């Protein structure tokens, strides 16, 4: 038997709230047949949105626009559709406050599974005792963070090239309704249970290019009968996948003959000018003639054999003819200012390319082609620090573009075959989370020194004087 009850609530408000959250538990928590409530919300007498069905323990939140409230005229719903499109962009695709969103990323460094779930939904996965019925304290959030890894490792299994990789809970954040950018690290504070959302990031590290991967999600209940997931494979457009009780596993196989993302091509450096040399035989000739001339003044019988011996070593001996020594009075020419600019630019671009590699040993090996060994560790830490976005919870930015702006010579040493420049460049990097892309462009001004080491140009010092953020933007990741 079906029974319907109609209620009309009029809510006077002293202030204009940005959000309203509705919950219902008609029939109590032990009702044999769960109740369903149709919610129709009116703002200033006009319907705000389409009717929404709300089940038990399924809160529904809605944003209120007081500057452009709903109207009853016919053009309103056409404007509403355009507004909803703009709102989707503003909310970065997360348009429902009560839905669960999941994002699966295949990247060269890791496989990453990100889940954004209402707190009340999460409590149906992993029950947690609360001191207050309507709030979750910071201590209780910390307790949830300790309990979640074990639960997630049971319900989420991942294999890379046939080997099981244990899930690591990298981040756990608790969001309120006013949060737009879920990638930003949140300070923990007491949150309301009815409208809080939980963001969790699971990572599965890789050891280089891989050929196959699979992820299985095995937890489903009445509140979460499926897990709506956007999958992003490297730089390809996103595709939607639904984890269900009948289809628990998502699988990926690398296309035939593919070997995964490759490191950007290496740029060639101009050669180091050769040091001026002189034949070793010429040194013997000079020594012989000098000694012979000195001996000739005293005893010609000694001078003649000395001249003959010096001539044989210096001129007729083929071994000494092939040997050379640095010229005592000449020095190697330094590159011209345009050539110095080119050398510094190529070195800097190759240094950033080194961080396309996955393992630290490979990064170091690539860096050694552009920097002197004594400077490697400092350079590695310096560049890596610049690629980490602290506001995104320590995420590693992927370099998309290196734009060389200008350089100006400051000093040089012909004998040491070194030169110094004042340089400016810009780096554009991206980080992806929750279905959207963070792009950051930073400008740098620095003093650098380049030196010829083992007949190759190497960076031996880099001092960053200024670092400024030129541009920062966030946009939705495209789908197929």
Please tell me what each predicted stretch does:
Residues 401-410, 444-452:
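Hydrophobic/aromatic beta-strand elements that line small-molecule binding cavities or substrate pockets
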Residues 335-398:
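Core segments of small alpha/beta cavity-forming domains
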Residues 355, 371, 395, 408-417, ...:
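C-terminal soluble interaction/assembly domains
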Residues 1-279, 365, 372-375, 387-391, ...:
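N-terminal soluble domains immediately following signal/targeting peptides that reside
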Residues 110-111, 115, 202, 291-294, ...:
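Secondary-structure-rich domain cores
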Residues 266-358:
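Juxtamembrane and targeting peptides
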Residues 445-480:
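Extracytoplasmic/periplasmic C-terminal soluble domains
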